[in-house]
Amino acid sequence: MKLPELRIGNLVAKVPIIQGGMAIRLSTARLAAAVANEGGIGLIAASGLPFDELRYEIQLARKLSPTGIIGINAMVAATQFAGLVKTAIEEGIDLVVAGAGFSRDMFAMGKESGTPIVPIVSSAKLARISEGLGAAAVIVEGCEAGGHLGTDRSAREIVPEVVAAVKNIPVIAAGGVLDGRDIVEMLKMFFQTPLYYVDVVIKQRIKQEPSKM
């Protein structure tokens, strides 16, 4: 099964997988670079890092993956959230993923610098608000995900609602995706969306014989 590319703003990931940002000092430059080198999007967990350490991690990731897509994941609830985002943008980070809260200010920072901002959401309402504020994409987390959760509902319930709510940005499902069957199940939620670039024949095969994909 050939997976479609993931387009976020001007970024194009050959493999539509974003590695989660696990704080503190778990998702570091080396993990992010390894994922980026395989065609996915690697994230450095910024929360809990001093600004100079974050700069070092971003620079190291760039050295290890010169052409890969490297982003940060930061918790909005963290005291130094704005400073972490500003520092990452100054270092030329490719995108900013933000969860554990919601910040309108981050969209202005992203717009000013041309950096894609990708909030983690748990409802169609917040996804719609995010798109209106300028989000380049949204990540949908349900109760299956780890970390700081905003709902007790399954992502499998929320994702179709978000897909219907937003108009022109990618929707990335997160949490509870453990194997190939889970990937197929999630992909089937996006079949009717215009941003899902998969041949109609492939879509039909997945619907009929998901166990063989």
Segments the model singles out, each with a brief description of its role:
Residues 1-172:
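Active-site entrance/lid segments in N-terminal catalytic domains of soluble metabolic enzymes
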Residues 23, 177-178:
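Catalytic metal-binding/acid-base residues of hydrolase active sites
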Residues 31, 145-148, 152-172, 178-213:
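Conserved active-site-proximal phosphate/metal-binding subdomains
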